[in-house]
Amino acid sequence: MKKKLLSVLLTGALAASMFVGCGTSTETTDTGAATGGDTATESTDTGSGAAGGTKVGVAMPTKDLQRWNQDGANMQKELEAAGYTVDLQYASNDVQTQISQIENMINSGCNVLVVAAIEASSLGEAMDMASEAGIPVIAYDRLIMNTDAVSYYATFDNYKVGTVQGEYIEKELDLKNTSDKFTMEITAGDPGDNNAGFFYQGAMDVLQPYIDNGTITVKSGQTEFSDVATAQWATETAQSRMENILSSYYADGTDLDICLCSNDSTALGVENALAANYNGKYPIVTGQDCDIENTKNMIAGKQSMSVFKDTRTLASQVVKMVGQILNGEEVDVNDTETYNNGNAVIPSYLCDPVFADVNNYKELLIDSGYYTEDQLQ
């Protein structure tokens, strides 16, 4: 099965990537710049209480991406509503900061840890400490690699995210039936994020046959994950790379038909590059997360689609799992085969991602209360 093979391959790739490249509830406010790197933090007492003094530590990677702000806020709201004290921390995309935050959560008596890792293979020291303290760990959206400390994994179906993107391109260009030829460039995610490989592989499993038969040409020649990955999902990095591709391969007037972008922050960088350096027919641009700026771009015709991952759903599932762990109950999972972290296959709960475009964004995002209309003006 392709996903099983991918999980084995990613274990090796992520290991290699290491060489490159709670009393009151507190929330660490990330004051870093737009792509991370500034590890300055400021702790703010949010003053939550909990039945029985049960504490849950929530470690988020950064506030630089909109989605992590939403994940953290949803998690805190759901956990506090369930009666727990929440120690919510953001680490400004700095691994050592995140390790210190997790260690502080352990030392301050947190009963369960929910961790969205900055780098999948870099938390071994903190995970060992959690394991020795007997504290269960739920890996949140990003699988923590090469440790036996991870009890459960909660995420979206990451392979499906990629297939949704690939199938959208396949359908929009009628690739199964057309005799036309198309050009494509690929912008993938952070090589330190286990999910990025699943997104990439899901899309490429749909599109690779069309590359192989000549229907799609990648003029830059950059198709391997290692060539198209974007460190820390940074918009500026994606923009700079796409500007170089446009000037090197499309300045002669060749149309670029497809920009396969794994998520919205990389898509935004690609869209910025297109606006500044490209005069041809506007390409299909994919994305993921339905960030506000990207949803605005969908409305304006600058992004073709995104994949909506309702973080409220994921937060609710994690809160349910926390309660089941603390009550000694069987924990709900729906995947016990796909996600191998290098030590073991981690019992996982996968939420469903949803296709979004200009035709259904109002129903998905506004009618559901995820955004207000004013936010998308």
Annotate each PLM feature.
Residues 6-13:
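Sec-dependent N-terminal signal peptides
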Residues 2-5, 22-377:
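A residue-level marker of the well-folded mature domains of exported/periplasmic proteins
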